[in-house]
Each structure stands twice: as structure tokens, then as C-alpha cells.
């Protein structure tokens, strides 16, 4: 045998049968070889012929099939183990790069060779060897005699499907075997008609599925109503819920000439529409593979009309403030995709498909009917199932570990939007990290105008898409890090990318930016840019208010209480200035409107096109304020004496409660106008955190004082901290969550957690009230009498420390930021410098006394426990590295899984236990700070006291509220009230 033939015979790809040359294998050799090789070749030939004969005999009772000369060469491969078959499977088409370099290709997208060497992997070039059918090998041409015999057998089987004709079938099969042996090497006659192989396959399928119809596909005068058959199949499919066909019903309807086929019912979801199906296998269909190939999936696209509806839903609801793609270009790709046959999809369509599927997933999720109180309808369940199915298809079509182009990064971002309301935040955090690293790898963080030359320059659409995509990922990273308490992934001084151009998508073309057509109108990209600027301010708030490490120069002066107080309040004032400047620069269409206003004129001031963006921006703005003022909430909610606190801290604690109330009112207003979506994460977590603030304040500020409330700043706060008003707002917030709980899994988790808080706090409060009622009634009466006598005898005056200019400005800063009356621009600029005057902040020292007549009532209740000791309880509240966490910090940690910064954690000094004291009510841990560490004594009542805290008990044994029990319940540890876990164990984040 020549050397070339030996190589072909021994090639691992020659016996697979995928590529056949049409020549039968040779059984003799022309070159001298060893006797062993001759015997092996003879044995192989005999085995091949024997196997072929046995296969033909064993198939005598089966349906006749079209026999080809390649059967004898492939029969051995059928009986081989599956592992060998997978190893010998040959890829039918290599990528363009591998074909050019003449290297092996695994047929994947991208292939392993292009992945290793960072080549561009594409399948665009046509197949030179076979231009008619690129990528699909041509089988050897069968003999016409074989096809004729197979056709006769198929017709006989279809018309005589009973046991009486088995002899005729056997005779036909024997005739077929004889013809195969006789005509195996004969050339094809030119004038003999050849039956089509597809027609034979069609006849066999019809005979197997619908034998009663007795169709003869070889009859040139066949009378078959194809339109009626299609209507019958559609009608039967519409009646089935599982896509199973009743073949008997199809046969009966086709045989009945008078049958009336009713039209199929209208489709209720995208799952009922016509689907375009394509199997894009990687040609490595090994079932033993642990990870399936990225291309080994079944693509199920809905009809074009349904797809466009889902795309518009994603654009108008899910991506209101996230414009990271060019919509006209997207619609062009969709039109091109649906105009092509799935078998003709090229590299461009293969890269676009994952992005399209992710958009369809988000569109299905946001298409659910809002505010469904009962069990979701069947249509709602179908939408959710379709969304999950599209998400899985998108995830399978991309290699998440090797995201290397714009379409893939956009796919990951859209998957994040889908996951934020259906998975936990920790999952979103991982995907955001992948998207950000991929964007940095592609250079999206750099301003390419500095590097582009005239020969290779990006067009305006590509350039603007890069900007949009980068800033969308960056602000997602900022937001989720603020929720989870994790570090920022990228600093502002590490990128120089410009903000996207504020033009409508239609005015950004391949050639130029059409600024003249925009004419200064607000665009959707402009709304997204305003949200991006706000997220920058949120990043500054996290950096300045929640630092992980205190700078050395600031730590040196941290022992100075007045300096540390002024320093932290100076930072807050700077951040308030940033928020005020952002608010002043907003376009008129995005100016916040008063959530308490019920007049229709105020709402109509905002164009309907930008109404949803206006509300979402307002929620994001209020979220920034909550995070800004959140460290001060302990000053106004605990039972500690307000006289020891800085008035500015009290005011900013009051601001946190005011903002939380404002969020609840705004959410309720959005529900009234059907604009609030529970699937939108920016709104959902802001509402949740606001209600948690109100619940926290309502319980610890109200029940620490026997239901009377305790307003530290008196008349200055008016009704801002009124317990009854806050209780009403909590009920409104609960109603909001009732409406949103069925919108997404995140909404349902939030609803369940807050319900647990309601139940736990109410149960502990009721138990505590029964225990202390007898002892507190007389004390409360005396306190109220003294308070009334003091208020009657002395006029209510403001203390000196509240009359300071900086303290007044602290009030005005917040009120001016949340003042919804439109003022003249000049007046705003003039008042800005006055309101945020901070020149004397470094020298300001507040008085440590607040007269009793300023408070509504005297404090008559004992504080709860050590966990209620918050910042500001000693010497004006040292907001430095000795910041001590309180109840709300632990609540924050439990709910979000947020790890508190070191400066917010207690000093880990373990107290010396008294070996003679076995009282279970004693405190086991001493939460001290270095500057104010006091000794802990145990009295006969089993209550631990801190000597530096005016002998206030750290743990009240008579109090029925056990915070550890509450946190254990939130953590679902299954131990109930006997949980031994501490309050800083973390839940899995959302």
C-alpha cells in the first residue's frame, strides 16, 4: 500500500464515517510488508465483510433503510466503545484562523487555539472544498437501484402495514441486500432517474407516525392538502400544554373531509409563539463532558413581534437609568437576525445572540403585572419561566471566564440586571466584578481620543457605547459595594473616560453626532449621566463617612474630642454641598417633586417621558442622604441623655428619620401612579432600608420611654420625630411592601425579613409592657406633672448651643436640599455660600447642657442594655476610631451581610470574669473603647454597670427584649431564643 493510503487507513478520523470519499476500502497491498501485517489486514477485511453481512441479516425485521457503500466502512465504528468514538469524532469545520494556519481546531466559539493565542475566532470564510454546503460533508452518492428498492419497500410498508405482508417485505429486503452486493462498485447511469433520499426519509417518517393516512410520497399525482395538515397540527398543538401531539386526532381530522378545524387560541405568552429552533452543536456531543460547549445549545427565539415587545419593555422599565447600548443598532441586528435562516447564522449573529437572550430575559421579568396581591396567574408564571429560560440560554452562549468583546460585556451587564431581583446580591457582586475586569481589559476606562489616529478610528456609535458601558458597570459597582459594605473596585483617579454624549440614540450615527437635531432637549443618555454623577457622590460618602482606615494625621488629633466632632461634621457639610450642587444642576424635567403633594399640577410639571426617570433619580438622591445621615440615628433613638450630645449630631439624626419618611411617601405615590416596580433594585433596597430605619426609631425611641417618646431638641423638630406620625408611615411602608412582595424574589425576602422584625419587636414590647406597667405609672405621672409645671412657669427658650450659626446652618442645609419649591437660579447661588458656611466649624465647641424644659418629657425609663449604648453617649459623642456599633449597626449587618469597618467595631478587650459569680444575667463581654474604658461591677440584682456612664445598667434583666434572640431569628439558625450566637454573625446577603 502506498504511504499515503497507509496514513489514511491508520488515521483516527478515517473510520468515523463523517467524511467519505465514495471509494471502497482496498483489501490488498502493493508494497511488501511483514507477514504479521498481511495477516492483520486479511483479518480486518474478513471481519468487516462478516460484520456487514451480520448487520444486514439482523435488520431483516426492521424497516428498510437507504443503504450506502459507506455502511461497510462505518459498521465497525458503531460497535466501538463511546469513549473511542468521542476521541475519533472529526470536526466538520475549522475556524478561519485555524484553516489559514493549518492547525487543528475543535470547532468551538472561540476555539482553544484562538483562545490561547488571543486570535480572533470567526467562521465567516466560505468552505473552499464545498461551496454549495459549507461546513457539512457530502455523503457518497448511493446507487439508484438501492434507492428504488428502498422506495418500493417504503411504499409497501405504508400501504400494507399488517402481518399478512411480512413475506413481501422480507423478499424486498433480500432483494435490497442482493442489489447492494451487486451494485456496490457500479458507476451511476446518466439517464436513470434517481429517487431523492429525503423523499425516502419522508416516506418512512410518515409511515411511522401516521400509518392510517397511507400516503405515498413517490406518487407523482399525490393529492395532499398541506394547508389543512398545518392547521390541524397547530390546532392539536394549541390544545396540548406539554407540546405532545395526539397523532390519532390528527389522522381523524385529516381523514374527515367535512371536519371544521377551529382557529388556534390567541397566544398568552411568548412560549406559545412560533419558535425558530437551531441546534448549534460544537461537534463534540460527549455526554460525559462535565461542562457543555458554549455552542452546544438549542436556541429558542420567540416571534419577532414578541421579541420587540420585550426589548421595548427592557428599555423603558429595566434600563431607565442604565443606557449602555445603542438602541437603533440593536434593532438593526434584530431585523438582520430574523431575516436570516438559522442555518445561515454567521459569526456576527452568534456573538449577538447571547445579548439578545439576556434582553429577552429582563423583558420577561419586567413584563409581570405589578401589585398582584394573591397567587400569581398562569401568565405571570409563564413570563417568569420564559425569563429564566432566556437567561440560561444567554449564560450558555458566552464563556463567562473569557469575556472579550463589547457584546459579551453587554450580555453580562444585562444578566446582572436580571439577577439583582432574582438572586442574592452576592451573586450580582461576582458578575459585576467579571464585567468590570472585562471592561478594564478591553480599555473601556480610557479616553481613546488620546490614542486614535486617522487610519484607525472608532465611529461615534462605538465610541459612545464604550463610554456608556463603562459608566454603567462602574456605578453598579459603587451601589452594590455600598449595600454590602465592601471596598470599591476602582478609584476615580484610575480612569479618564469621558461621560457619554447627551444625545438621543437616533442622533448618534456611524458618521457624526447630530447636535443640531437635538436642539438642547433632554435625552435618555442625559438622565443616565445625572444618575452617574449622583453615584460619584455616593462613592464620596462611603469613602469619607465609612473609612476602613483612619489617616495618620487625623488619628493624631483623634484624642481631641472637639476636633474630632468638628472634623466629622465638616465632612458631612462638604458632602451636603456636593448634593446641593448636583440638585441645582439638574434639568427642570428631573427636579424632585414633593412626595407629600397631592395636586395634579405638580405631577404634570414633569413630562410623562421622563416621569419614571424623575422618580428613580429622586429615590437614588434620598438613598444617598440616608447613607450620609445614618451614623447619627443613634443620637435620637436611644435613651441616653441628649445633653451629652452635639446638637449637630441630633439634627442629622433627625434628618435620617425625615428622609426615611420621605422615601415611604414617595414609594406610596409611585404605587398610586403604577410606576414603582419591585423588580428594580435601586428602589427596592432604598425602600427597605427606610422602613427599617423607621421601625428601629419607633421601637427604641418610643418604648425606651414607656410609650411617650423622647424628643431631644424639642420645638425645633416640630413633628419630624412624632411617634404617632412615624407609626402611620410604617404602616404605609408595610402596605408598599405588600404590593411589591410578589414582584421578585428579592421583594419577597425583604417582606419576610421586615415581617419578622415587626413580630419580634411587637412580641417583646408587649411582654415588657406587662412587666413594667405597675412600676412606671406613678413615675410617669410625676414626670408629666413636673414637666407641665416647668413649662407653665418658664417660657420655652432655645439653649445657647442651638443658637450657634453653624447649628442653624445644619438645619438649613437639609431643608434647602429637600425644598421642592422652584426658586430663581440667582437666589439659589447667593444662598448656597451662606447656608453652607463652615468657617467657624473648627473652633465650634458645643455646650454640654440642654435644659430640661426643651425636652418634651423627662426621661423616666432605664435604658435597655449595653447594646443600646451608641455614639454620643459620653462627652458629646466621639466620632473617631473609637466609634462603637449599636443596635442598628447589628441590624444592618444581619440584613445585608455587611461587615462593619474596623473603626465601627468595638475594641476587642475581653473583660476579666468574676469566678465567684454564676449569675446568667451578667454581661459576658465588655464593649469598651480606649478613651472611655470603665470598670464593670456586679450588683445584687444581677445588672452590670459602667462607672463612666453615670451608673446606667448595661443589661436590664427585667426587660423582655432580647436582641440576640431577634438576630438569631433573622439568621434562621433554628435555635430560637436559645441561640448562643452573637449579634455580629452574618446572614447570607441578598
UniProtKB/Swiss-Prot annotation:
Q: What is any one GO biological process for this UniProt entry?
A: filamentous growth
**Family matches, as CDD domains:** fungal_TF_MHR (cd12148), GAL4 (cd00067)
Task: Write one Gene Ontology MF term.
Answer: DNA-binding transcription factor activity, RNA polymerase II-specific
Q: Does the keyword Protein biosynthesis apply?
A: no
Q: Which keywords has UniProt assigned to this entry?
A: DNA-binding, Metal-binding, Nucleus, Phosphoprotein, Stress response, Transcription, Transcription regulation, Zinc
Q: Where is the composition biased (Polar residues)?
A: 9-23
Please give one Pfam family short name. Answer: Zn_clus
Q: Output compositional bias ranges, type Low complexity.
A: 24-61, 160-179, 282-293, 773-793
Tree of life domain: Eukaryota
Q: Name one GO cellular component term.
A: nucleus
Where it sits in the cell: the answer is: Nucleus
Without the gene, what phenotype results?
Answer: Decreased hyphal formation.
Sequence segments annotated as region (Disordered): 1-88, 160-192, 255-295, 764-800, 915-944
- Which residues, as ranges, make up the DNA-binding region of this protein? 95-121
* Physiological role: Transcription factor necessary to sustain growth on non-fermentative carbon sources such as sodium acetate, acetic acid, or ethanol. Plays a role in hyphal formation.
Protein family according to the UniProt entry: Belongs to the ASG1 family.
Record's protein name = Activator of stress genes protein 1
Please state the gene responsible for encoding this protein. ASG1
